[in-house]
Amino acid sequence: MGFRIRESLLLNLRKVPGSRVKARETMVSVTMATSEWIQFFKEAGIPPGPAVNYAVMFVDNRIQKSMLLDLNKEIMNELGVTVVGDIIAILKHAKVVHRQDMCKAATASVPCTPSPLQGELRRGASSAASRMIANSLNHDSPPHTPARRSDNSTSKISVTVSNKVAVKNAKAAALAHREEESLVVPTKRRRVTAEMEGKYIIHMPKGTTPRTRKILEQQQAAKGLHRTSVFDRLGAETKADTTTGTKPTGVFSRLGATPEMDEELAWDSDNDSSSSSVLQYAGVLKKLGRGPTKASPQPALTVKAKATSSATTLASTPKLRRLALPSRPGPEKKPESLPKVSILKRLGKAAVVSEAQDSQVTSTKSPTVRCIVPDPPAPLASQRPPRRRWRRTCKDC
């Protein structure tokens, strides 16, 4: 393809002799462009044969270096690049070249600072010696090199300089990144202290200063007192015994009764039950050995009548009541228990009344004896009602 372009250009030059200069300029620019693109593709890693073909296609389609970022897969297929590996390599290398061009533009835009020697030469340019030196330097300067050689050398130098600048920039960026990582302060993990958890750590003085020694002596003196109980702190000499004994106590013992009194009460109840089961019903039973009786039969009353009538004496009916047990000394009176009734009383069987318990009635006229039979006690509400009792005739009456 390159040879064909050159042949066509030579034919055009022969036909039009006046345009030889323009043709030469275009031919130089084309060869420069193709050489640049060939170098570009070689740097991308493409073999020499396909690299020449791709360079001619880029030159024919007027692709410039500023259009590298606009290349994509579709455009590469239209340009005749169909190999997928070549497409990927060209696109990657296009990004690298674009970065290098940007770096060149940045370095060219930065103005170079003039050196102090150049400033001094400019200041002293008005002197004759400086003028002579400047003229000699201008005359001794080498002639200008041809255009082709200068262009090729500048292109090669620019590529090498751009590569060096890119490498330097990459190294500088890596160093800056490392410095940033080294300067980053490591974040400390949050430590939960004992105060946050609710525990307090008290650091006691070690006794290095006189003040701390005094504090430690006071603490040791306070520890030697051994007043630990509440009674000691309040000033009490002995503690009150709040513990109860292991011996079981009853209600009467807590009220003030003694075990001896309880035994006597139990003995009396046993005697009552045994006597009531053996003896017959004889009115009110009285225990003479257990204390004085409270009720006594009242004396007979004498009634004086008129002269015509005889004086009659009326005997008062004795009051019948059951005597309770003799009272014993104690802090409080015990509640009276219900009287125990014998079987004969519950059955309602009449008992023979002894002569000692009969009431006698005397009069001045004729002595008469009356027998008073007391009524049986009323049955308790909790007991069974008595059976029908049998009537007996009193032999004495």
Swiss-Prot record:
Residues 300-316 have a biased composition (Low complexity). Residues 135-156, 289-316, 354-397 are annotated as: Disordered. Residues 356-367 have a biased composition (Polar residues). There is a cross-link at K239 (Glycyl lysine isopeptide (Lys-Gly) (interchain with G-Cter in SUMO2)). Pfam families: DUF5577, SAM_4. Residues 385-397 have a biased composition (Basic residues). GO terms for cellular component: nucleus. This is Uncharacterized protein C19orf47 homolog. It comes from Rattus norvegicus (Rat).
